[in-house]
């Protein structure tokens, strides 16, 4: 199991250390993944500290149950198999109404990318799937083969920011009229054929942005992150902290917006006095995002686009 779920944790110390861990605190790893952040965070907790780990991928939880066994044996870890958009209600089931810190490592994990049959990668031939939760109903196959032209253009442009969204959607529409598009390599080839030759000379795979867009749509990644981060801000105790690692501009813009909204007074400008209930709930720990070190970038190519934003709760 361990070898099957190899994952190099990004911004490990930065994301956890910035939570300013209290040994007896209650913490949440909203994106368990390869359990690297969880393992480090647990090493900083005392016997009374507790960590709640969310993941919708059963394989991630199975792997973590091996990796974190010493802490499980001490009763310091609780696994919750669910989408983190249900953060508040699932924690409430465990009697938790307030937390000292929470960490998000957004996006798809390395094992999910590397596992061919999950259909996340444009580099390997596999059925079109892209579900983070293998029990979920919507797959990439449904998106590609049943969404109408306008819906395809919308998600390609909104979530992939690809300027050739219309041309790609048209190619897909033409191809699926003959037979369903069923594999990742079929889709990648169609995307490539829709782009002009000069575009194909640019760095990066021509299908990258469209695969990202479909993955975000299948898993409602931005909707889930938006809902979950807002719940997390409410759940934080005074002086509690939230760390969010993002890997593309859409996630980062969302996080930046939510943090800015919560760190701005909800009162008209020019008021001589701001009532406590209108004061900001958050304070930014770092104005600019924290980036991986040069050493980390050399060791892990997937860290290149990572950004970390951290905020602290200053008002309940």
Curated annotation (Swiss-Prot):
What EC number(s) does the entry state? 2.1.1.199
Q: Name one GO biological process term.
A: rRNA base methylation
Ordered alphabetically, the record's keywords are:
Cytoplasm, Methyltransferase, rRNA processing, S-adenosyl-L-methionine, Transferase
Per UniProt, where does S-adenosyl-L-methionine bind?
A: 35-37, 55, 84, 105, 112
Q: Which InterPro entries did the record assign?
A: RsmH, SAM-dep_MeTrfase_MraW_recog, SAM-dependent_MTases_sf
Q: Which reaction does it catalyse?
A: cytidine(1402) in 16S rRNA + S-adenosyl-L-methionine = N(4)-methylcytidine(1402) in 16S rRNA + S-adenosyl-L-homocysteine + H(+)
Group of enzyme by EC: transferase
Question: What is its subcellular localisation?
Answer: Cytoplasm
Q: Which Pfam families does the entry link to?
A: Methyltransf_5
Q: Is the keyword Cytoplasm assigned to this protein?
A: yes
Q: What does this protein do?
A: Specifically methylates the N4 position of cytidine in position 1402 (C1402) of 16S rRNA.
Q: Which family does it belong to?
A: Belongs to the methyltransferase superfamily. RsmH family.
Q: What is this protein called?
A: Ribosomal RNA small subunit methyltransferase H
Organism for this UniProt entry: Streptococcus equi subsp. zooepidemicus (strain H70)
Q: Tell me what gene encodes this.
A: rsmH
């Amino acid at each position: 199991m361990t070898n099957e779920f190899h994952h190099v944790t990004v911004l490990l110390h930065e994301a956890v250390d910035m939570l300013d861990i209290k040994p007896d605190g209650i913490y949440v790893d909203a994106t368990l993944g390869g359990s690297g952040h969880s393992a480090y965070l647990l090493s900083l907790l005392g016997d009374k500290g507790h960590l709640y780990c969310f993941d919708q991928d059963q394989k991630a939880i199975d792997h973590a149950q091996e990796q974190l066994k010493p802490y499980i044996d001490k009763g310091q870890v609780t696994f919750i198999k669910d989408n983190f958009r249900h953060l508040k209600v699932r924690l409430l089931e465990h009697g938790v109404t307030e937390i000292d810190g929470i960490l998000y490592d957004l996006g798809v994990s390395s094992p999910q990318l590397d596992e061919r049959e999950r259909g996340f990668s444009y580099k390997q031939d596999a059925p079109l799937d892209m579900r983070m939760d293998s029990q979920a109903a919507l797959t990439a196959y449904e998106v590609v083969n049943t969404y109408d032209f306008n819906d395809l253009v919308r998600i390609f442009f909104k979530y992939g920011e690809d300027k050739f969204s219309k041309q790609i959607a048209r190619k897909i529409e033409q191809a699926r009229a003959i037979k369903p598009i069923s594999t990742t390599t079929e889709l990648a080839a169609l995307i490539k054929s829709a782009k002009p030759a000069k575009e194909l000379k640019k760095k990066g795979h021509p299908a990258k942005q469209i695969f990202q867009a479909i993955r975000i749509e299948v898993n409602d990644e931005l909707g889930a992150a938006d809902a979950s981060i807002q719940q997390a801000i409410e759940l934080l105790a005074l002086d509690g902290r939230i760390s969010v690692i993002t890997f593309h501009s859409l996630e980062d813009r969302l996080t930046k917006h939510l943090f800015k909204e919560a760190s701005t007074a909800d009162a008209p400008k020019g008021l001589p006095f701001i009532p406590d209930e209108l004061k900001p709930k958050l304070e930014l720990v770092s104005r600019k995002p924290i980036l991986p070190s040069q050493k980390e970038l050399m060791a892990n190519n997937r860290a290149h686009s990572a950004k970390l934003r951290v905020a602290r709760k200053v008002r309940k």
